[in-house]
C-alpha cells in the first residue's frame, strides 16, 4: 500500500493531523496543532549488562578520517525556574556544584584517552543546561580548561556557553573569554520588563541591553539571544518592539522560538488561575512568526535554519545546524544526550547516580540504544527540512522505495506548505511555521515505505489552544513503574524498561520525556 492508499485509509482526524488540512489558510490552520519531531526511530535498546562493553568497544576504535563531530556538556543547575521551562533539574548549591564539576571533569579526563575521541576533531562544543552561566567563576574556569585540555578542538571550533543575562558580570565574563568561549547563547525571551518578569526573568529591559553591550565590548565572542513569541501579555506591538530591540542591540543574531504551553506546567497553572494573561493561540503565533520572518528578512538578516537568524557575519550557529544532521555527539554531564557510530545514549539525570558511575570509571549512561538502519535517511531528511527544503531525488537515489514521497510533497504543494522549483521543494512561509509537522510526518512516511511500519500517533503537544493533553501519559507511568521495580529488586534497568523507553521516545512530548528522566537512575 502506497502513501496515497494509506492516506485514504485514515480517519479524517488522523488524516488532518498527519497530512494537514485542505482548503484553509495554510499559515494559521495548516494542521490542527503542532507536533514534536522524534529524530530517533525504531531503535533497539541494548541490554544493560552489555552496554558498558559495547560503549568501550566504540570508544577504543579510531575514527575513519577526520569527520565533523560535536560534544555536548550539560550543566543541570538553575538559580530560578522559568515558568515555561520543561528542563529544570536542580537549584543551585555551591557544595553540590563543586562536587558535580569534579565528576564532570573526571568523566572528560577518563574519556579523552580513548582513540575514538582523541584521534578525531571536535568542531563544536555546546555547554547547555540548565543554566551553565550560573557556575561560579572558579568552576567555570576549571571546566573550560578541562574542555580545552581533553577535547581535540578543531582550529575553527565553536564553543558555546548557554546562560542568562543576570549572570553577565565582569568576574565571570573575564573567565569565559580567557578560557576559550567564543559564542554566548543567552535566554532573553523578551525585552519587555513586564513580560520577562511574569515568566521568571529577573532583569529589566535597560539592564538586558546594557549587559549585552558589556559582553560585546570584549569583542571575543559571538553574542546570540533567544526570543520567544506567544508569551503572556506579549501583544503584536510588544513582539515588534522585541524585534526592534534585537536589531539595535549588541547581539550578533537570535533564535526565534514558539512558546508551547503544556498542561500541568507552572505556566499553564498560572494562566488557569488567572494570575497571567493567556498565551497566544497557535493561530496568533503563526501571525507572529510571519511578522518576525518578514521583519528580519527586510533588514538583511541571514536565515541559518528554521529558528536561527544571523545579524552579522560572525554567527554560524554551527552546533545547532550539526545537531540536526546526525553527526557524532560526545555527551558529558548529568542529563546529557549524544550519539556515536550508530548508537545513541542519555546520561544519568540524577546527580548522585551520575557521580557514582563516574567514580566506578563507567560511562554514566542510563540507556544505550542501537539506532535503526534507516537512521541515516532520517538524518538527511531532517537536515534538509531544517534548512527549509526537501529534495526527494537525493533520497530516492539511496533507496528507490522513497519515490512515493513525491506524492506527499505534491499534496503539501496543493495545500500551500511547499513549492516545487523544478529541482526540489522549498517550504513556504506557512511550511516554515509548520516545519516540525512536515518533518515528523516525512520521517513516519519513510519508516512506512522502507520498513512497512505505520507508527503515526496522535499525541498532543501544546495546551495554548485549549486542547486536552496529559502531562504524564499511561506509557510514561508504565516506564516509571518498571524503573521503580528494577530499583527495588536491585537489578537495575531491565531490558523490558529499556525497550519501553525506546518505544516511548518515538511518541512523547518533551514534558513527558522529562517526567521519565526524573526517575531514570534514581
What are these regions (language model features)?
Residues 78, 252, 421-423:
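Beta-strand-connecting loop/turn residues
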